Amino acid sequence: LTNGLKRNVERLFDDKGHVFLLALDHAQSGVMTGLENISSLMDKLAFAPLDGFILNIGLAGNLARPPFLRKKLVLRTSFGASSLASSYPQAHLNHVSPETALSVGADAVLMMALVGGEDYSSLQPLAADIDAFHQYSIPVVVEIIAAEFDKTATFDVQYHGARIAAELGADAVKVFYVNGFEKVIECCPVPAILAGGPKDRDIGTVAKHAVDCGARGFAFGRNIFQAKDPLEVIGSLREILG
């Protein structure tokens, strides 16, 4: 890594080596419950103990104002298809240039790695995109999902996918909790950030075990913004992460 990229990767994490992100990048779902008015939601959580937000390009401007100026912007730069599409895509292609990411003040970018199926159509462009952002010393976080989406939270997808993404140059990976999660962390040479995913498990229990296994952060969405009391959930998760 270049010195500039090293500095930028380190600055993504706090002094304890942790990062807590609120994921609001659900454009594929159109209007998701809890995200009817993202700007209003962000205002309500402005002073919550979050380190930053994951946003799509069209909402990045929400962080260009007090009190968000010191919050991290992790910019999602890839997109697949909407939930209304007739079929699920085999690749989420990048649609934001490094220059545009810099122009909106992104601290890092986030893109998908789809593994399984015809994953060469996803992984080859991913490797090139990582390299393109690294030319500008922009950190890249890669989220691991399955080409058959319902297999995303399976051990093989997360275990092998995280390692593949790291070897293609990812600076951190966003991974889903699976049985055997400690092996995912053990065999991944870059920091792992836990994704929230569906609300079918107690998020506090999952989060604590993930941190015990070595996860370096959280990137949660629905488990927070669809909660009865998002601030309470954020507070309890921050306590777990430290």
Task: Tell me the role of every PLM-derived stretch.
Residues 1-14:
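N-terminal basic/disordered segments at the start of proteins
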Residues 14, 19-61, 65-68, 72-82, ...:
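Alpha/beta enzyme core
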